[in-house]
Amino acid sequence: MQFRIANERNNKIIDLMAQVTLSWVENGDDRTMARRRFANLTLERQQVNLFPLNWTIVHPIDEQSPLFEFDEQTCEEKRLEILVLIEGHDEMFSNTVHRSHSYTWDEIEWNRRFVPMYFPGPTGATVLELKKISETTELPPEDQS
């Protein structure tokens, strides 16, 4: 599972950290009510020292992941929600900055990957195309789960 973020301002963000929490509803039996559950997701990288262009935050879905057995139908039934919290230090204003976002089960794009959003410009400097931040393409069949 992947999320992509970018800094649309010219000021530097350092010591950027990401935390991703999974939330789902577990139905009770006849005597207990449904309960919302939470689990922190392990990330390939939780922190970057400098946030120059973009960052693709990755949670590997393997046997240790709470999402390992989830498919689209399970996500809907359990009313899955993914909470993303980003925190970093804005060098220009010497402030801690926060950003959070929530994704519900119906916003998940299955069997897709992000398209590249940066390329070399005419002077050789890297150009970041922010309009492509959410743009995805279908995975080839051999890479689909």
Q: Locations of the language-model features?
A:
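Extended, solvent-exposed segments with strong compositional bias
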Residues: R35-E76, G88-N95
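Short, surface-exposed linear segments at secondary-structure transitions and domain or protein termini
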Residues: W24-N27, L41-L53, Y103-M117
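Generic alpha-helical propensity signal that fires on short helical segments
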Residues: T21-S23, R31, H59, S100-T104
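Acidic, serine/threonine- and proline-rich intrinsically disordered appendage/tail regions
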Residues: T56, E87, M92-S145
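Intrinsically disordered, low-complexity polar regions and short flexible loop motifs
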Residues: L83-L85
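Extracellular Ig-like/FN3 beta-sandwich strand-entry sites
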Residues: E77-E81
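Short, well-ordered strand-loop elements centered on a beta-strand within folded domains, enriched
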Residues: R31-F38, V97-H98, E129
